[in-house]
A protein has these predicted regions:
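Acidic, Ser/Thr- and proline-rich intrinsically disordered linker/docking segments
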Residues: 1-63
Length: 63
């Protein structure tokens, strides 16, 4: 199953921009609330993705 989220780009020349992404929930290793600020960090095989949605919203989408 895929879920659609809003990625917050955190590095490079486009840092701070947002874009819509689709993630296969089978590929998610873990997710945790961002320590400073809003959003959630999602860990996938190729690295981490920071999204605008809260930890609770992601938990509901995956369940």
């Amino acid at each position: 199953m895929f879920i659609e989220l809003t990625e917050v780009i955190t590095a490079g020349i486009t840092a701070g921009h947002k874009r819509q992404i689709s993630i296969n929930t089978n590929r998610i290793i873990s997710f945790a609330p961002v320590e400073s600020g809003e959003g959630t960090t999602i860990e996938v095989k190729r690295g981490n993705i920071r999204v605008k949605e809260t930890y609770e919203e992601i938990k509901e989408l995956i369940a």
